[in-house]
Amino acid sequence: MTDDRPVVLITGAGSGLGLASSLFLAGRNFRVYGTVLTEAEERELRQEAARRGLSRDGQGAVTALRMNVTRRADIDRTVDTIIREAGRIDAVVHFAGMGLRGFLEDLSMQEIRQLYDVNVFGIMELTQAVLPHMRARRSGRIVITASAAGRMGEMSISGYSSGKFAVVGLGECLRQEGALFNVQVSVLEPGLIYTPHFGINRNRARRAQDPTSPYYFWFCQHEAIVDKLLAANKFTAEDIAGVVHKILTARHPRLHYMVGFKLKLMVTLRNIVPFEWFERIHEKIVVRMVAHPRHPATGLSGLDAGIGERAKSHHAAETLSKIHD
C-alpha cells in the first residue's frame, strides 16, 4: 500500500517550537522526521509522540533522528535515511537554532561563529542537501525560521539579530531560485515566544554577565524588559505550529509569515515611514525603557550615566589636546 502522507523534515524537534510543530503535523497526517541533538531530546520526542498515539506506523508518524546541523556528515546521513525509508522529502522546516544575548563588544568571535554555524550555515547546508531531491521531483517546500530580530535591530542582540537578518535575505533569494523548479520557500518570523528552552537558557554571552562590563547595567535592564514582554505574550509554541501547518498546506504560500500584531505593525511602520521617524519611535518605546531606570548606586538613569560618560570622554579629549598644544 502506497503511503501518500506528506513527508516533512523538521530540525530542532527535541524542544520548543520544533517539538510542538512535529507533534502538531504528525497529528494531522504528516509523516514527520524530527532531528534532535541529544539523547534526552530524542527521548522527549519519542515519549511525547507515544503519549499522543503518534506511532511510527500509525496514522500519524514521528521518527526521531540524531543530527547536528553543523556537521555535513550528519546532514547527509539524515537525508539519505529519509529518502531510503520514505522515498522523498516534501518539506523541510528549519527550527534548529540558538540564541546569543549581549552587546557586540561583549561577544567573543568564538561565540559569534558558533551562532552563525547553527543559525545561518546550518540552514544553508541542509537546504543544499535536500534541494537536489526536490528539484528532481519539481516539488517541495522550505520553511526558514527567522525572527522579529531579522526585521528590526535592537541593542543587546547584535550577534543574534545580524544572523536572523542573514536568513531573511537567504529566504528571499531562495524564493526566486526555488521557483524555477516549483520549490516554494517561506520565512517564518515569530516574535518573542516563551518555551522551556528559552526560559532556562537564553545563552547570554559570558562577558555580558560580567559586572565589570561597561554595558552590564544596560544589559540587565534589557533582560528585565524581555522578561516582562515574555510574561505578557499570549502566543505559544502550538500557535507557531499552526502557522507552520498553514504554510505547508497553503496552495500558494506567501514569502513572509509574521506572527503577532505588534510585530506586523512595527515592520509596516518601518517600511512606510522615513527611517529617521521610525528610529525615534523605536527609541521612545525600547531604548528609553532600557536607559531610564535609576542606577541603585549612583541615582542616575542609564541615559544620564551614558551622557555623563560621554561628557567625561569629551573633557579628557579636550585636556589632552591642550597638553599637546
Task: Label the predicted regions.
Residues 147:
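Residue(s) in the substrate-gating loop at a strand-loop-helix junction
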Residues 55-73:
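Rossmann-fold cofactor-recognition segment
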Residues 127, 163-166:
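Active-site helix of classical SDR
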Residues 180-231:
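C-terminal beta-strand-loop-alpha-helix "lid" module of Rossmann-like NAD(P)-dependent dehydrogenases
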Residues 14-16:
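Conserved glycine-rich cofactor-binding loop
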Residues 103-104, 111-113:
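Substrate-binding pocket helix/loop in short-chain dehydrogenase/reductase
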Residues 28-44:
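Conserved glycine-rich Rossmann-like NAD(P)H-binding loop of the short-chain dehydrogenase/reductase
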